[in-house]
């Protein structure tokens, strides 16, 4: 057979496979109906293991692993279809709620709003807020939780919080608070962070013994701090540390903060750009008490808890793969009160309104204990 004949044969086999796959997926609804009548869950691990072992045993030895991979994927898509059908019977689905939210907020992202930020004037959260909103009315709070409470209580319409840094990693305190408060992420921003060593006028580097800043900033400037033998002390916020140094009677202290803090608090930039990496970015999220999906949303955030058993997280990841959804962030955090058990945060690169995302939202609960849809939004670069 020449290549043209081989390809023609492959086309015929692929047509047979496609027809069989469609037939297999169509019958998933009948399977769901039977499981409802019998009171059975969508996922039956014993049946699935038995089925996969049987199929692998019938396949040629050289194709056993590929057979398991193929049919595990088919079963995952079948379970997703079964769960989607069951959720539709229950009433409005998660994706339908999300689309209703988008329809209700079918306006551009607001240019002005009351915004809660952690810290004081000059904080990086303030800089982020001013890039996200043209005219933000900013209220400052000492802690991340204070920002959350301000939004929850209606004092501010939005909150701006740092959630991860390209050098120092995730801001775990914010992830933990997201699990406690019923909020929605409506936008995000990647902000380039350039840290500066700020001192009182006339202070020399040789005079500095102790440097104050937020823990994330200290981690991002670890090389500079260690290289100069400085003692680092954590402070609630970079701008607050600059304010503290300005008000201190000591002349042997410095702050790591933004350049704008030097002007605000009468300090000097002793050493500019002291971060370990020039490619230093912090990602900020905008939180809202009300669910909102603005036009152009192409990123989705979820929180998922799984059973504490082998393969539990794999089944979630398998569902993403089956629906061809790109996973761009996975973060695990301990579940309070449950030793050595974790919740998982996912960021997905998937346009809002796509069939893949709708199918995921309407079926993911069959492979996890619980999940929270934080929202779909645009990331500003």
Q: What residue ranges belong to the model's regions?
A:
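Domain-level signature for soluble enzymes in the chorismate/prephenate branch of the shikimate pathway
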Residues: 1-381
């Amino acid at each position: 057979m020449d290549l043209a004949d081989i390809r023609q044969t492959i086309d015929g086999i692929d047509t047979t496979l496609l027809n069989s796959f469609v037939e297999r997926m169509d019958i998933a609804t009948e399977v769901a109906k039977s499981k409802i009548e019998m009171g059975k869950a969508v996922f039956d691990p014993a049946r699935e293991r038995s089925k996969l072992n049987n199929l692998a045993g019938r396949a040629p030895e050289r194709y056993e692993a590929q057979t398991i991979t193929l049919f595990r994927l088919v079963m995952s898509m079948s379970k997703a279809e079964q769960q989607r059908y069951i959720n539709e019977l229950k009433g409005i689905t998660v994706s339908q709620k999300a689309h209703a939210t988008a329809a209700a907020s079918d306006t551009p992202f607001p240019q002005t709003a009351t915004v809660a930020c952690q810290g004081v004037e000059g904080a990086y959260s303030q800089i982020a807020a001013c890039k996200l909103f043209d005219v933000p009315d900013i209220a400052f709070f000492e802690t991340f939780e204070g920002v959350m409470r301000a939004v929850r209580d209606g004092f501010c319409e939005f909150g701006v919080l740092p959630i991860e840094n390209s050098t120092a990693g995730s801001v775990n305190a914010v992830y933990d608070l997201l699990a406690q408060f019923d909020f929605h992420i409506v936008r995000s921003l990647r902000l380039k962070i350039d840290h500066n060593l700020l001192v009182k006028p006339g202070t020399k580097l040789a005079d500095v013994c102790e440097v104050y800043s937020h823990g994330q900033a200290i981690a991002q400037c670890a090389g500079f701090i260690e290289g100069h033998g400085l003692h680092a002390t954590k402070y609630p916020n970079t701008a607050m540390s600059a304010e503290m140094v300005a008000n201190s009677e000591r002349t042997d202290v410095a702050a790591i903060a933004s350049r704008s803090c030097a002007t605000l608090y009468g300090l000097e930039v002793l050493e500019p750009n002291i971060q370990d990496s020039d490619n230093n970015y912090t990602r900020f999220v905008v939180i809202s008490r009300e669910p909102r999906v603005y036009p152009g949303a192409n990123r989705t955030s979820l929180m998922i808890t799984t059973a504490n058993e082998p393969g539990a997280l794999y089944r979630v990841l398998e569902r993403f793969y089956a629906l061809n959804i790109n996973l761009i962030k996975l973060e695990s955090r301990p579940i309070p009160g449950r030793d050595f058990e974790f919740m998982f945060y996912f960021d997905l690169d998937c346009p809002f309104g796509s069939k893949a995302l709708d199918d995921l939202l309407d079926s993911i609960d069959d492979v996890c204990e619980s999940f929270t849809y934080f929202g779909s939004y645009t990331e500003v670069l």
